[in-house]
Curated annotation (Swiss-Prot):
Binds 1 Fe(2+) ion per subunit. This is Lysine-specific demethylase JMJ26. Residues 614-837 form the JmjC domain. Gene3D superfamilies: Cupin (2.60.120.650). A motif (Nuclear localization signal) lies at residues 62-69. Zn(2+) 1 binds at residues 193, 196, 216, 219. It is an enzyme of class 1 (oxidoreductase).
Amino acid sequence: MEGEVATNGVILKHNGVKDISLETCWPEKKKPVEATSLSSGSSDIEEEISVECPKRVANQRRKRSKADEIKTKSSRKRKCDDENKCEENEKKQRSSVKKRATTWKEEEVVVDDEKKCEQQLQLVPSSKATSRSRSKKSVSVDTWLVNNEIDVSALSSRSESELSDSYLKTEYFNDCRSMTRSLKANLGELAICHQCSKGERRYLFICTFCEVRLYCFPCIKKWYPHLSTDDILEKCPFCRGTCNCCTCLHSSGLIETSKRKLDKYERFYHLRFLIVAMLPFLKKLCKAQDQEIETEAKVQDSMASQVDISESLCSNEERVFCNHCATSIVDLHRSCPKCSYELCLNCCQEIRGGWLSDRPECQLQFEYRGTRYIHGEAAEPSSSSVSEDETKTPSIKWNADENGSIRCAPKELGGCGDSVLELKRILPVTWMSDLEQKAETFLASYSIKPPMSYCRCSSDMSSMKRKAASRDGSSDNYLYSPDSLDVLKQEELLHFQEHWSKGEPVIVRNALNNTAGLSWEPMVMWRALCENVDSAISSNMSDVKAIDCLANCEVKINTLCFFEGYSKGRTYENFWPEMLKLKDWPPSDKFENLLPRHCDEFISALPFQEYSDPRSGILNIATKLPEGLLKPDLGPKTYVAYGTSDELGRGDSVTKLHCDMSDAVNILMHTAEVTLSEEQRSAIADLKQKHKQQNEKELQEQNGLEEEEVVSDEIVVYDETSGALWDIFKREDVPKLEEYLRKHCIEFRHTYCSRVTKVYHPIHDQSYFLTVEHKRKLKAEFGIEPWTFVQKLGEAVFIPAGCPHQVRNLKSCTKVAVDFVSPENIDECLRLTDEFRQLPKNHKAREDKLEIKKMVIYAVEQALKEVETLLLDRS
């Protein structure tokens, strides 16, 4: 019997198996488990907390009638002859209440002693967190809840309208104080705050959900400003999964990172889709190796099947790179027996073809002309000069012999120039060819039909689309922009794949809505890093190396000062905004270890986890590398940067135009807006005029150019949720974009605000940021424009490999990004790998950090293993 199943746009035919219906496996929502009480009276108190019992109603009526009685007496007193004295007494009473009472949203005022206590509260709570076991503390808490006369649930059930009355405010806080005294009397040393581990707090609030944890008022106000004390009583931050105390922040496994579990049928279809996509590239790699073996057979004057290839000694923890082009070597390569110089197969072909590039070293250096020049004034006498040697060095000859053999590289290129390079292997003999044959055999049993179209963006669905460009006659001016809830559906994954295969960016809205809500305040993250970690790491966290966006240089700054500037802003002496940014902080190789909860929270927020999950994404080729093999650093990486909504034109908080070798997804986790004063705005306007005059003078002196007036025609709109402005270019427009940048390179500034005079690669140099004016000129001269859109808080932006992009921060932003490798973009990854190897030596983008060829072969191997296991389970 023959059946068909469709997934990922692929139709599977199989023999002897019944038709399989592809159903999305939705994890059932677990109901919160009610806290079990260890005392005999726990059921009574739970009933009293959960329902509106007659006793509570009578209690509340009695309190309201008492409040009405007080109001009546107060009104009668106003009619007495001693009216002035009564008013004076009332003022004193109100003043006393204001010092003692607390409201949830508008008037949270603490008594003087509490203020002193809050001032004494250290920025970083004590790292000596006490472990509180359920077995000991829960019994005491349960006993206290049963025997205590204070109605905790009645406190949490009152509305703001009830608490607006002064009498009820006072009574409420007296009850809270009485509750705290009772807690301390019954629990003793265990009556401590879960957040700061201190027991001398005046107000402690117990969670009625877990009946275990307590939080003090200063910690609630400082670390959980979005929660009221009623919220804490109902469900504490720990039970909500948002506790940011040091102990919890260093705990892993508390957050479920996977949103949707795949059943075995879905896994089978995804793996088959991956094998289909990878096989053509595996064949190319095998073909290149077969050609090299045939060449070696000619050198040895033997048959290809008789060529003996010795194994190169290489461990799994070692990366092997070509000494000439810095490309990763996967299997076959040539090596010098004398000096161990190693050459990849691509370089071997280029030597035999006679088109090998010398790849000279990059000599780019920018001249420092002083801080006055950076701010638009005259340059200071230069103490340094630009060391660019424009004289062309003679080309070094490196040719192959007539039989195809290649000698070691000349000494000028790092070799010895003496011995003939020998053919070496890293993998077992015929391992790759056997893998290719195995994949072909597997796919031969199944037929493939053209995929169906799942795109519904052509219909009137404004919620799924976002306008990002105004290209004439183009059908891709709108970007696919689903909600995070929609992406959990199987049909939306197919919808995503259709846009993704075209090289289009994707924006997913509200990615943080499905997370626990952990705080991404930079101060919370910094506190977690400074406590409960190795002392050496903790000491290194006191200072950070940030990038000054104006001079484009690293500056060392105190970590606390940096984060204060994140929320309050920083300026130079002339009131020009100082824009600083931290890249990859903390380092991504330590991010998961130092901030495990934040790492789990980020992964749980990732949409389309079949692609983006860095741990177990079934269509993420980077996850297929076997254990023990050295893996590339793909993140997650954190980016913390200042920002302002107005485009300054010089020193903006930006990520300059660049192109990533792999796919990436970037989520805006936190923003903070810094308001500029009128004095600062006036100073900025004056300084912009100085910058303009400086530009006009320099351009006139160099090329007779004149700076044009900026006329903005951008379609983006900013609002309170806006965070970052993105410009992403189409792959097809890259040649025209590069031509424009080479033509106008002198108009751009980079390090020390010096003009860009030398271009090695207009995109990979990362020296350019296109302002509004440059984007207008680009469209006028070359007819191309990027997708331009604003990333809002909680939005995830998917960037395909090979799409040049730039970002400008409209506010202080905390973004987290992770790289991944999708089957649809393997061809682009390989193209970029070859493009990077053509860059000069010591160019920052030259190294093959991705090792995409290695990923391809191991992805096919791992997918075949998993498919075989699934087939055995089905049989």
